[in-house]
């Protein structure tokens, strides 16, 4: 698979460092300044090599997003799946996801329009604390669209699928403790 990621991570050292320090470590992960500084300084050096080898597709919040869609389509044409983290993590990462961004739905719509393909969307939940990954049943963009759902509604349906996976993990862990 090829992941989507913040375009800042494909920028120069200063751009990567600022994103890691201010946004990723402090805003999203809630790390203290020293830990954020140390990690941002080290990882801003290493990340270009990691992301180049991962073939990270940079995502944007503006018109350049069409570039992300075109690049994604070329990988899909080659049979390579795209990994999207659609949760809104602007306030940090929570176990129960409050909001999904619509990018994954926009991608599904783009592929549908340009290739007439209903790409499967698999909801996935990873619990770092419980060290478990749960993969749900595939969702069909066309089916949801044909039912009259908007992009925002489809994103929310997918979010609820992912949160259900989290609930499954919790229930399974409770049963294991008994």
Regions found by a protein language model. Name each.
Residues 61-178:
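Non-catalytic C-terminal accessory region of glycerolipid acyltransferases
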Residues 1-61:
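Catalytic core of membrane glycerolipid acyltransferases/transacylases, capturing the structured
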